[in-house]
């Protein structure tokens, strides 16, 4: 599958290539010392939505493997919201879909709907999080630290 054929240059996401700078920018307006921020980050007690951070880290890992970044959004019927799959990577004539979650696996409606909608084009679908490896139906649950091995 050629993902470059479906590029939409009017829709894009921006990621920072320096994750340390990204974390600093996330908390630049808060009166907390740098060491306190990183201690809370490491202990998973940071008062923030870390989804952006984990998605940024994932983007960094994927580009470091030499891959281009692709994602997919589509309208959720009967709603003003959209579904979004964080990353798509081609594998031969199929694609691998990745959904990144900062905490547990929680809700993952987008990747499930993507798998239902595009099942014949999908090789593997991954939910990347801090949790242990596992499987839920056709969805592979993988810990965040394994992402570089899944995209090479």
Set out the residue ranges of the language-model regions.
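Accessory nucleic acid-recognition modules appended to NTPase machines
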Residues: 1-84, 89
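Hydrophobic/aromatic beta-strand patches that form the interior of the parallel beta-sheet core
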Residues: 15, 98, 126-128
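Residues at the starts of beta-strands that form the adenosine-phosphate
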Residues: 68, 123-124
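Residues at alpha-helix caps and immediate loop-helix transition turns in enzyme cores, especially N-
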Residues: 83, 107-111
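Active-site beta-strand-loop-beta-strand hairpin of nuclease catalytic cores
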Residues: 89-97
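Short beta-strand-loop-alpha-helix junction that forms the active-site gateway
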Residues: 100-108
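Arginine/glycine-rich "motif VI" loop of SF2 helicases in the C-terminal RecA-like domain
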Residues: 114-123
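Domain-level recognition of nuclease-like catalytic cores that cleave nucleotide substrates
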Residues: 130-152
């Amino acid at each position: 599958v050629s993902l470059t054929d479906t590029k939409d240059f009017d829709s894009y996401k921006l990621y920072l290539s320096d994750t340390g700078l990204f974390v600093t920018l996330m908390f630049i307006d808060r009166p907390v010392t740098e060491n306190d921020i990183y201690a809370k980050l490491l202990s998973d007690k940071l008062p923030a939505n870390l989804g952006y951070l984990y998605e940024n880290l994932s983007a960094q890992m994927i580009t470091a493997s030499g891959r281009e970044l692709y994602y997919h959004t589509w309208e959720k019927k009967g709603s003003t919201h959209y579904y979004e799959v964080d990353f798509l990577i081609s594998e031969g004539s199929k694609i691998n879909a990745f959904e990144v979650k900062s905490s547990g696996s929680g809700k993952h409606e987008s990747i499930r709907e993507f798998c239902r909608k595009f099942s014949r084009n999908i090789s593997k679908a991954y939910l990347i999080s801090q949790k242990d490896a596992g499987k839920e139906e056709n969805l592979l649950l993988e810990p965040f630290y394994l992402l570089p091995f899944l995209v090479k």
